Amino acid sequence: MKRIYSIFFFLVLLSASIRAQDTLPAWQKGWMDIHTIAVGAGECTFVIMPDGTTMMIDAGDVTKASKDPHNYPNFMDDPNRTVGERIAEYVLDFSKDLPRPAGPDYFLLTHFHGDHMGQVKGMLPGANGYGLSGITQVGEYLSFGKFVDRGWPDYDEPSRERVESFNKGFMPEYRKFL
């Protein structure tokens, strides 16, 4: 029993030195930071490369796709804030001291699913002629250098109909945004 108490005491002391809420140190030249942004309703990764070049990979939003709030626990603190706002706020916070603080140098869209780019369900009206969800909403807050996706400018591989079927209704919004 004494041994169990000793082990327990050791683990308590060890855990005191581990703090999950510590802020990440600022990026430094030569470092590579890879941030998976946990917005709870889609995929988004922000990369700061050793030379300060930045890239965002995907910016999805499927907030309205599920009625179960347990699927998106990160929205419990303020359900009025959107995925786009959360992503932009995070990126701007970590970009303050970078060569291009207003937004990533590159945006890479891996594929045309809602959890990677946004979707019609839950889309907000935009003032620039396209709906806001996922990447189109993030683009309201951040300035991007170059976009990379599969299919620009025709989006016809394997066929236009097939590409449109990947994310019904949102591809026209994405094209207008670009």
PLM features per residue range, with description:
Residues 1-4:
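Positively charged n-region of N-terminal signal peptides that target proteins for export
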Residues 6-15:
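Bacterial N-terminal signal peptides
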Residues 12-13, 68, 121:
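Alpha-helical transmembrane segments and their juxtamembrane interfaces
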Residues 19-56, 60-77:
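Zn-dependent metallo-beta-lactamase
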Residues 21-33, 39, 79, 90-106, ...:
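Flexible, acidic/histidine-containing loops and adjacent segments that form or flank the divalent-metal
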Residues 48-50, 60, 83-86, 90, ...:
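Mature, Sec-exported extracytoplasmic domains of Gram-positive
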Residues 110-111:
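Ser/Thr-glycine-rich phosphate-binding loops at phosphate-binding pockets of nucleotides
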Residues 114:
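Short active-site segment of divalent metal-dependent hydrolases/proteases
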